[in-house]
UniProtKB/Swiss-Prot annotation:
Family statement drawn from the similarity comment of this UniProt entry: Belongs to the NGF-beta family.
Gene encoding the protein: bdnf
Keyword Secreted attributed: yes
PROSITE patterns with a match to the protein in the record: NGF_1, NGF_2
Subcellular location: Secreted
Name used for this protein in its record: Neurotrophic factor BDNF
Function: Promotes the survival of neuronal populations that are all located either in the central nervous system or directly connected to it.
InterPro entries: Cystine-knot_cytokine (IPR029034), Nerve_growth_factor-like (IPR020408), Nerve_growth_factor-rel (IPR002072), Nerve_growth_factor_CS (IPR019846)
Transmembrane spans: none
Entry keywords, A to Z: Growth factor, Secreted
Native source organism of the sequence: Raja clavata (Thornback ray)
Length: 43
């Protein structure tokens, strides 16, 4: 089953686990950066 965000609570899923794991880490880091940036702007 596909996850629109490219990752799940259990971890990344894909045909190529190495590829998807790399994409997942990149996405999560990007989301964290946006979240921190948003908090700085709000607070």
């Amino acid at each position: 089953k596909c996850n629109p965000k490219g990752f799940t609570n259990e971890g990344c899923r894909g045909i190529d686990k190495k590829h998807w794991n790399s994409q997942c880490r990149t996405s999560q880091s990007y989301v964290r950066a946006l979240t921190m940036d948003s908090r700085k702007k709000i607070g």
